[in-house]
Regions:
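Soluble extracytoplasmic regions of secretory-pathway and membrane proteins
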Residues: 1-543, 547-548
Length: 551
């Protein structure tokens, strides 16, 4: 640009006329400022590169380990510091040239910096790696592998005080438990006969109730007291299944204003079947269902409630309607319109409709709101429909996991939410994690790959959380299936990341002591976290760095 404006000339020396590159004063000043700013940014990049090296890769015995190795720690990091100083000095030279009207000094300084980048930042580290580190890899890298082990144990909560070693586990000569031994009877009686991974079709066939209801493909396990004993139950919420709607059920009014909520929770003791199967002709081996829904609630009205031990969980479910759940949320777009104009619109039970009474949802009335939703969902009915009035609400973000991540975007929700009954409502419990993607020296893992095994298909983690180097199950989230209320409770109060976020958002996460006793009874160790820790232990179960072997 300066060339075409005449501010920059390339002259050949003729007689007494000076040759070379001729810069006008305004061009020189601009180059001085731009060059100085550019070199300041280069210096900042060199400075930050030092920290990035702490999350680099160490190649050791065929295995890739996270962290700065011998060469990075002893050569590259000091080299980056030296280059930072050189870049800053070069920037100062450019700024000084703005006054002294001479670009030769900053040009020479820049050339020196480029030579230093090649020599100190490239040739020297290569020489140290090839001539010093590789011939003595075990000794040179041992200190840094030890740092990796320590940081990784901290990052995934696998420190010695959190681990219990079972010395007799897996040994052939380990003593067998005696039939009359402590806890043996209760353990044997609680052995699961029902597999939640394959039981969904049985629940659907027996307890679907209506064709537009459904259960998730994989059910879950929860614990309830039966008498004085704690017993495992296979549990599933009966939700609206958007993919099961057919015919006129799929039009806009029915899909979003009529079929708005599910109905109840279905359970079966995991250690019991209805009858023993002895041959192929027997019709036994099915779950012994316990159903808590609108119909069972109506049947109990007027009857004396009993708490006698008849082998059931006796759930005190007072609101079985389910407006929020992972199956409902598969509807695209995921919203429901409630409190619409006229008579009750929502299907409840056969022959009866219902009007939502919860505090959840956003007001959809008013022309501005209706226009905004019409644009958002490309749906003209928001403007044209007479069903939407000043009282109408729209229920959004109906996936419990999505609600948790919307309330606290700095948390990563577990790949599954499990239902339970607390305070008379069906509630979803979501394990939430604090994560970091580049904790120095901590081993990086791909969550999608680690969480996949023979029993579990690849799960859907948040797209931004494909790879992490820090994972703590620090928060338990509870989402009300009726009104969508989200409550967060701190569970790992020693987690420094959680403490930092609680300082940023005071009052958002409640203390662990504020958990109700009923909620505490349904807290479990997250399966996803267990799989991640299992994978990490397979890498660092040997604490001596020189004894580590390839995967």
């Amino acid at each position: 640009l300066h060339y075409f404006q005449g501010s920059l000339e390339f002259r050949v020396r003729q007689g007494k006329q000076r040759g070379g590159v001729i810069l006008a004063d305004k061009a020189r000043k601009q180059i001085s400022i731009l060059g100085g700013v550019l070199l300041v940014l280069v210096g900042v990049r060199y400075w930050l590169d030092r920290y990035e090296l702490l999350s680099g890769d160490i190649k050791f015995k065929g295995q890739t380990t996270t962290g700065a190795g011998y060469t990075s720690a002893n050569v590259l990091i000091p080299a980056k510091l030296l280059l930072t100083v050189i870049a800053v000095l070069c920037a100062i030279a450019f700024f000084v040239s703005f006054v002294v009207k001479d670009l030769r000094v900053p040009a020479l300084a820049t050339a020196i910096m480029l030579i230093g980048e090649v020599a100190v930042g490239g040739v020297l580290p290569w020489a140290v790696e090839q001539l010093s580190v590789k011939p003595n890899k075990a000794n040179k890298e041992a200190e840094f592998i030890a740092r990796n082990i320590k940081a990784t144990r901290f990052a995934y909560n696998l420190r010695d005080d959190n681990l219990t070693v079972m010395p007799s586990f897996g040994k052939e000569n380990a003593p067998a438990p005696q039939p009359g031994g402590k806890g043996v009877a209760s353990t044997l009686s609680n052995i699961r006969l029902l597999d939640p991974n394959v039981l969904s079709p049985a629940f659907t066939q027996s307890k679907q109730l209506r064709s537009f209801y459904g259960f998730p493909d994989t059910l879950t396990i929860d614990r309830y007291h039966v008498g004085n004993e704690l017993q495992d139950y296979v549990v599933a919420v009966r939700e609206i299944n958007p993919s099961a709607l057919s015919g006129n059920q799929t039009d806009w009014i029915n899909r979003h204003t009529v079929y708005t909520h599910g109905n109840g929770i279905v359970m079966a003791p995991a250690n019991t079947v209805d009858a023993i199967v002895t041959d192929a002709g027997d019709r036994g081996g099915n779950p012994k269902y316990e159903v808590y829904d609108l119909q069972s609630l109506a049947a109990k009205q007027g009857q004396q409630h009993t708490t006698a031990n008849n082998g059931t969980a006796h759930l005190d479910l007072r609101e079985p309607r389910v407006y929020y759940g992972p199956l409902i949320a598969k509807q695209d777009p995921d919203y429901a319109l409630v409190k619409t104009a006229g008579d009750s619109q929502e299907y409840d039970v056969e022959g009866e409709n219902y009007t939502y009474q919860g505090k959840g949802g956003v007001h959809a009335g008013g022309f501005a709101n209706r226009l905004a939703y019409a644009i958002e969902y490309h749906e003209l009915n928001f403007i044209l429909s007479n069903l939407i009035n000043g009282n109408t609400k729209i229920l959004l973000n109906r996936d419990p996991r999505a609600r948790v991540e919307a309330v606290a975007p700095w948390l990563t929700a577990d790949t599954s939410a499990y239902p339970t009954v607390i305070d008379g409502h069906i509630k979803w419990i979501v394990d939430a994690y604090t994560t970091l993607d580049s904790l120095p020296y901590a081993q990086k893992i791909n969550l999608g790959e680690v969480d996949t095994d023979s029993q579990t298909a690849r799960r859907e983690w948040s797209p931004t959380m494909k790879q992490v180097s820090y994972l703590r199950n620090s928060v338990k989230a509870v989402v009300d299936a009726y009104d969508g209320t989200v409550q967060l409770y701190s569970f790992d109060e020693k987690d420094p990341v959680l403490r930092a976020w609680k300082g940023v958002f005071p009052g958002l996460v409640k203390e662990k002591s504020e958990m109700s006793e009923q909620l505490r009874q349904h807290i479990r160790y997250p399966e996803d976290m267990f799989k991640v820790q299992r994978e990490i232990l397979s890498l660092i179960h040997i604490s001596e760095p020189t004894r580590r072997t390839p995967i």
